[in-house]
Amino acid sequence: MQFIQNTILGFFDSSQKSYEIPVYQRAYSWEEANWKTFLDDLLEQINGDNNYFFGNLLLEVIEKNKKYEIIDGQQRITTLSIFFRSLFNTTTKRKTETALEKFSSTDKEIIFLRNGGNIKLRPIQYDRACYDALIIDNDINFETCSPSQDKIKKAKKYFEDALDKLETKIILSILDK
């Protein structure tokens, strides 16, 4: 077993990397208390109150430097990608010149969500259509059909609402972490 310390950007950095959640993993289950802790931890790091530690992830290499299965950490990684979709939506709504100079949603989407046909995170089949519609394609009209899909949709809304309340400079500083 090999341990590698990495940043969030380093985790997603390659246009070829993709992560799949194996069929035996549970569906998305995080709720508001988890989302709040996730966001609070990020904001504390920005304020210098702590060094955000995302935690350990256990990956199985399927194809070296390209394809991995997430054995442990799938709830955190799924939440992170939902958070980034919400972050992209929030910064896109804000028309400040500073935000536009610093943040290109197209560039960040390529890094964190997809590059062409390569989707970075593939949830379990049960949640995949929902995830692709709400997070990858940003379809606001997608109708959920399960508790886990409801949670994906609610997480996206939770983060968008929370980010809407923050100053643009704070939101942009999240991208630097």
Where are these predicted regions, by residue range?
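Glycine- and hydrophobic-rich flexible loops that cap the catalytic core of alpha/beta enzyme folds
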Residues: 1-177
